[in-house]
Amino acid sequence: MIITALIAIAVGFLIGYLARKIIAESKIKSAENLARTILESAKRDAENKKRELLLEAKEEIHRMRTDLEKEIRDRRGELQRLEKRLLQKEETLDKRAETLEQKENLLEEKQKEIQQLEEQISLLHQKEIEELERISGLSREEAKAILLESVQKDIQHEMAVMIKEMENKAKEEAEMKAREIISNAIQRCAADHAAETTVSVVTLPNDEMKGRIIGREGRNIRTIETLTGIDLIIDDTPEAVVISGFDPIRREVARIALEKLIEDGRIHPARIEEMVEKAKKEVDNMIIKAGEEAAFEVGIHGLHPELIKLLGRLKFRTSYGQNVLKHSIEVAHLAGLMAYELGADALVAKRAGLLHDIGKAVDHEVEGPHVMIGAELAKRYHESDAVIHAIMAHHNDVEPQTVEAVLVQAADAISAARPGARREALEAYIKRLDKLEQIANSFEGVEKSYAIQAGREIRIMVKPEIVNDDDIVILARNISKKIEEEVEYPGQIKVTVIRETVAVDYAK
């Protein structure tokens, strides 16, 4: 049994081995067949691809050959065209050269003819000169001198006539242009101002107030007149009192103080002093505001505060009845407009025009003409040299060296000379009153002085610590003599010297 089993196992092994061998050989043959099939297919594909590539290469070569042949044909055609154009140009140049040669030959012939004619003309000219010398008995040089002299006289006469015509034309054109510039400036500067007066009227609530203003034995009215330096005129005019004085600042102080007293109702010397001080401060503020408004109206910035204050004081100054501040504003506008027309520095012209009369704001207190005072003030407060020069030149105290200085001078003359701008009589009257005060203030010991009663009286306040009661009589006499020597006036002037000693104490 065991042997049989072993034989069976061996036979099974052998059969399995043979079966696997047969299967393996079959797979190998199948693989070989598949490999041969794949190889043959690859060879066929490669052969097909080769044929395709060869075909494409042949087509590309054919296309490139066709393009190259076309390009060669095009280049050949272009060369043929260029050759044709060159041939045409050569033919044209040949023709031009031939024409030029013909013209040169013709020109040479003409030059020869001209040379022959010139020689003939020269001979004829020489013969004419010889004949003229023989007939006139003058040599060539003598005849030339006579001819030149005659021609020179004619030319000089023509030149003189021409120069005269040009001068007249230039003057006419300059005058027309100047009139045009000035008329344009005047039309564009629409300024209006009324003539200043020397009186102010204060309205009263009733006529009983007149008695309160006068006060017991006139002490209130005397205090007002003494503190303000004006005349207070109380007459039959209903419900009104008149403040008269040539200094507008004093008159304004008196007006404001009186209106405040009337409004307050308490009128006595102590209250009057208080209100006058308040009025002075209010007028100072008005002066600063007027200066600032003037600078703003003209368009000027950067003025020193002291110049602003002095400008404001010009509001209370008059020149021949014309308000000096309004006059200065008008001059600034006119000078600026004319500067714009001429292409000059309009800002310098306007600034100098506004400040040209600044010296009039202080010429009561400082000696010298207002032009020099104004220039000194402008220099002190750091104005430019151009502005200072224009101020100095506006009355020809110095020769104007700049266009702006000339324009300020012209604008000043235009503003002052237009009809209705100024009144001589009023200015002469004010100057006479001003002169009276200057004479009184020139004496030692005088504290202040006021010309009142339309210049028929001058009241002088003296310092009691310097002038005693005996000295005031001599002082009044000396002032009277000086007035007689230096001032022309009708009638007589009353000189009143007041010495007042005030002692103040308090009861505790």
Curated annotation (Swiss-Prot):
GO terms for molecular function: RNA binding; RNA endonuclease activity. Its EC number is 3.1.-.-. It holds the Pfam family KH_1. Residues 324-417 form the HD domain. Keywords: Cell membrane, Endonuclease, Hydrolase, Membrane, Nuclease, RNA-binding, Transmembrane, Transmembrane helix. Signal peptide: none annotated. It comes from the Bacteria. InterPro entries: HD/PDEase_dom, HD_domain, HDIG_dom, KH_dom, KH_dom_type_1, KH_dom_type_1_sf, Ribonuclease_Y, RNase_Y_N. Residues 198-261 form the KH domain. PROSITE patterns: HD, KH_TYPE_1. SUPFAM superfamilies: Eukaryotic type KH-domain (KH-domain type I), HD-domain/PDEase-like. It is an enzyme of class 3 (hydrolase). Its main location: membrane. GO terms for cellular component: plasma membrane. The chain crosses the membrane at residues 2-22. It is a single-pass membrane protein. CDD domains: HDc (cd00077), KH-I_RNaseY (cd22431). One of its GO terms (biological process) is mRNA catabolic process. Endoribonuclease that initiates mRNA decay. PANTHER family: RIBONUCLEASE Y. This is Ribonuclease Y. The lineage of its organism: Bacteria, Bacillati, Bacillota, Clostridia, Thermoanaerobacterales. The gene is rny.
